[in-house]
Design a protein with these regions (language model features):
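Glycine-rich phosphate/pyrophosphate-binding loops
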Residues: 26-31, 240-250, 560, 585-598, ...
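Catalytic alpha/beta core of large soluble enzyme barrels
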Residues: 160, 203, 207-208, 274, ...
Length: 743
């Protein structure tokens, strides 16, 4: 055989040709490899290397979306990758021992590596591209209710359904916030348990009605009758109660709610078994299933005498958990175990915590699954077109729960979301805009566009006020179509004035610094990422891990959750995150470092930061050689040191300057090159516009032009740019039309 990697690439291409449900949704696939597999090192680095290739293509001008040519060209993009980690490896890691990679056929040792080195490779790859995730094999199988049927070897693509091969389950989730009374600040336990009971029965019926892709999966699903009941909106519930997601109390409440979820489901399952009998494979798994049920119950009581469990558990804190929730959890598990011992269970598994991405939108959830909120600010797409900016729906109830007055709450929310109106705005308002030459119709158009504007500048452009207004203001087409044109600055507003007006109208998008808000309440509003341009707070990655650990002892399967990390997170942070997860009894975990993929669905910041792709040694060599060009400085001297104590002058162009525009076609693509010159004819700025090449290439060319212009104004000779960039090649390329000296 050519090895597992070649066949994984075949499977990846096959998945790329399949659309989920026959529509435009991408295929969902999980690929898992045991940590002692001979090809494990290649597997770990597979997607990281492919991500590097995709970035190179994107940098060359290909679109960065997942359906674009860049990602379609590389392999490994149609699956989530995970490695299976047994307890033996964790012990080798702790003792800085060796780890053997063994043949699949006869078990012979193919290679011996340091456990620490392999662990670092996993973290490095996850840092670069968010894959692989980690599944803890020993923990998974210690909670296995049906080991007579074999080991649990794999999971579904999101990693919450962990059970025997050739089985399946249907998912259903409840919106926790719908059971919470904001006014009286009470969680309706009776209704919650009633809903859990109904949905357990519904999912059991769905086993009979479901269709399966193969005879083997149909048979396995009938034999074990696994269910996938779960919940969503935990993050919103805690915020509405005025409780921080990353807090001991928050984890105690999450543990109790999850204990009720699974306890009530198994209690109902046992009742059904008393009428129609347990699942067909129950008798051969009875002892193990009752052992697992007993461990679930012990976690509700924090009794710490678990059977067959080799790791610590984050059980419900008996002192912190509210009495009604604690009693509700314990009552559910008392009933589940008592009835199960009498009648068995209709279902081998009952619950998972799924990501609830799509159904969460339909259920009016601010947060999905067990996640905290991603950010406080949302942009809601309107049915009639356009967008409406709304704050997290939980901010108001949370402030009410924390004791803030209605006036204080309104001002805090306005601080976050803004007034979305010119009325009362400092500096930029109806009166000042009229004085600058805008008429009532112009101002009304701007006012109507503000609710969907991310920043105030987005409401001041030719698409909002129209070309006639630009002409009336004597602004040329060349100016207002330029990518860096700012109408407010053109009208004479300073950056400080624009910034203050922006915060008033569009809000800060963070609650940090809000009027009246006490410092001790800030943690209640912490999100997975920094909020807004000025936000600094976010939930530490261990806050995510501990929340998973609080819920895991009460889940039949596992938890699909992303541990969000900031762009600045290190490889060591990821190593620590994965290692701590192993010790807390989490079954499976995945991380995502902001910006680690060139294409991502949500972004918290537009700051580029330094490129993590650069080789430090190569960067150092380039920097040192560049310094030698500046003068007689020793190799290794930095520009900061060379210019210490001096000010590097920038030679600004006059506000009215001459230049020229060159229209050309490169391989049929129209390009405009515009320049600005000093009075002596020296080049001082360039602008590049290219049609029909997408926002990415246009943006890159625009940024390139700005970089060159800044360099020229700081005294970098034009020849240096010419020598550096001559003979570079990338698309679009070909014959040039429009200039007699360039072909």
């Amino acid at each position: 055989s050519s090895g597992v990697m070649s066949f994984l690439k075949i499977g990846d291409r096959a998945a790329g040709a399949i659309k989920s449900g026959g529509t435009t949704r991408r295929a969902a696939k999980m690929v898992i490899l045991d940590l002692d597999h001979p090809d494990i090192e290649d597997f770990i680095e597979w997607k990281a290397i492919e991500e590097d290739k995709a970035r190179a293509l994107i940098n060359a001008g290909y679109p960065s979306d997942y359906n674009g040519e860049a990602y379609a060209t590389v392999s490994g993009q149609n699956s989530n990758n995970s490695v299976r980690v047994p307890n033996e490896f964790i012990k080798a890691l702790e003792s800085d021992g060796d780890w053997e990679l063994t043949a699949r056929t006869d078990g012979s040792t193919m290679k011996t590596v340091k456990a620490r080195d392999l662990w670092s490779k996993i973290a490095d790859a996850a840092w670069r591209c968010a894959d692989p995730g980690v599944q803890f094999n020993t923990t998974i199988n210690e909670w296995h209710t049906s080991p007579a049927g074999g080991q649990i070897r794999a999971s579904n693509p999101c990693s919450e359904y962990l059970f025997l091969d050739n089985t399946a389950c249907n998912l259903a989730s409840l919106n926790l916030v719908k059971f919470y009374d904001d006014e009286n600040q009470v969680f309706d336990i009776t209704s919650y348990k009633h809903a859990l009971r109904i949905w357990t029965i519904v999912l059991e019926i769905s086993v009979e009605m479901a269709q399966f892709p193969s005879k083997e999966i149909a048979q396995g699903s009938y034999d074990y009758r696994t269910l996938g009941l779960g919940y969503a909106n935990l993050g919103s519930l805690l915020m509405r109660k005025g409780i921080a997601y990353d807090s001991e109390l928050g984890r105690a409440i999450a543990g109790a709610l999850t204990a009720m979820l699974t306890g009530e489901a198994y209690k109902t399952s046992a009742e059904m078994a008393s009428v129609v009998g347990p699942f067909p494979k129950y008798s051969e798994n009875k002892d193990n299933m009752l052992r697992v049920m007993g461990n679930h119950r012990k976690a509700a009581y924090d009794s710490n005498d678990y059977v067959g469990i080799s790791h610590d558990l984050l059980a419900i804190d008996q002192n912190l958990c509210p009495d009604d929730l604690l009693k509700g959890a314990q009552d559910s598990w008392d009933g589940a175990l008592e009835l199960g011992e009498k009648y068995g269970y209709r279902n081998a598994q009952a619950t998972v915590l799924a990501p609830t991405g799509t159904i969460g939108l339909l259920m009016d959830c601010d947060t999905t699954g067990v996640e905290p909120d991603f950010a406080l600010m949302k942009f809601k797409k309107l049915a009639g077109g356009g967008y409406m900016k709304i704050a997290n729906q939980s901010i108001g109830p949370a402030l009410n729960a924390l004791g803030y007055t209605e006036k204080e709450t309104d001002e805090i929310i306005q601080y976050v979301i803004g007034s979305m109106s010119l009325d009362g705005s400092p500096f930029v308002n109806r009166e000042t805009l009229k004085a600058k030459g805008l008429n009532e119709q112009d101002i009304d158009n701007i006012e109507n566009s503000l609710p969907g504007a991310f920043e105030i500048q987005h409401a001041f452009n030719v698409f909002v006020v129209g070309e006639e207004t630009m002409q009336r203001l004597e602004i040329s087409e060349e100016e207002y179509t330029s990518f860096d044109f700012n109408l407010l600055e053109k009208l004479g507003f300073t950056k400080t004035e624009i910034d203050k007006a922006n915060k008033f109208i569009c809000g800060t998008q963070t609650i940090e610094g809000a009027p009246y808000l006490k410092d001790e309440d800030l943690s209640v509003f912490d999100c997975a990422n920094k909020c807004g341009k000025d936000g600094e707070r976010f939930i530490h990655y261990m806050g995510h891990v501990r929340m998973m650990a609080a819920a895991q002892p009460f889940i039949s399967g596992a938890i699909s959750k992303t541990v969000n990390m900031p762009h600045e997170a290190t490889i060591e942070d990821i190593e620590n995150c994965y290692f701590e997860s192993a010790g807390l009894g989490i079954k499976a975990i995945a991380i995502y470092r902001d910006g680690s993929k060139a294409s991502q669905p949500l972004s918290a910041s537009s700051d580029d930061g330094e490129s993590e792709e650069s080789d430090p040694q190569v960067s150092e060599i380039i920097e040192n050689e560049s310094m030698l060009m500046l003068g007689n400085y020793a190799p290794g001297t930095s520009p900061t040191k060379a210019y210490a104590g001096t000010t590097r002058p920038r030679f600004l162009l006059p506000e009215r300057r001459e230049g020229w525009t060159q229209e050309a076609r490169i391989a049929g693509h129209k390009v405009y090159l515009r320049t600005g010159e000093y009075p002596d004819g020296t080049l001082g700025e360039v602008f590049i516009d290219i049609a029909k090449e997408g926002a990415t290439l246009k943006g890159v060319l625009g940024c390139f032009a700005i970089a060159v212009s800044k360099g020229l104004q700081y005294g970098v000779p034009l020849e240096e740019f010419v020598d550096t960039f001559t003979f570079q090649t990338f698309e679009p390329r070909g014959m040039v039309e429009g200039h007699e000296n360039i072909k």
